[in-house]
Amino acid sequence: MHFNNFLSNKTRNHSFSKSKIDNLNSIPFSKDDYKILESPITFRETLLKLINNAKSRICINALYLQHDEAGIEILNAIAQAIKNNPNLYVRIYVDFHRAQRGLCGKGPQIGNNVWYQQFAKENNLSLNIFGVPVKKREIFGVLHLKGFVIDNTVLYSGASINNVYLQKFDRYRIDRYH
């Protein structure tokens, strides 16, 4: 059965026509304007290079910025970028609940939020890291966006910032969505 048979008449009447789609706001780009990064190592290296060369802004959305070697590497790069350019616009958005804790199953740990505060104090920085509470309890939903805007470059990813997703060592998590 064709999908349209499941739609109500009201829905069908409000569907997008080609002319409506053509009139939506957009940013045109060609195939030469984007690149697919095919490995987590390439992604991490590209992210670090962009951060190190940032001139105007660094905006990061991630489920979490983990207090591990990869997270430290990224946060150190951001701190250095701020020191090199004090007028750099930096905003990092992470899930509120994930920032309150460390890794599950690793025993007692300080939350990532405490690490962010300690890092900022030790480096004499004003870091804008925001915990976004999507729901009142983590079990009901989290901020799961993963996007990076550095100057005029946009990186989309399925990776949060930690050792496993950025393949800091020999381990890498391959998600089932491929």
Please describe what each predicted stretch is.
Residues 1-3:
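Non-Sec secretion/translocation targeting segments of pathogen effectors
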Residues 6-53, 66-178:
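HKD-type phospholipase D/PLD-like phosphodiesterase module
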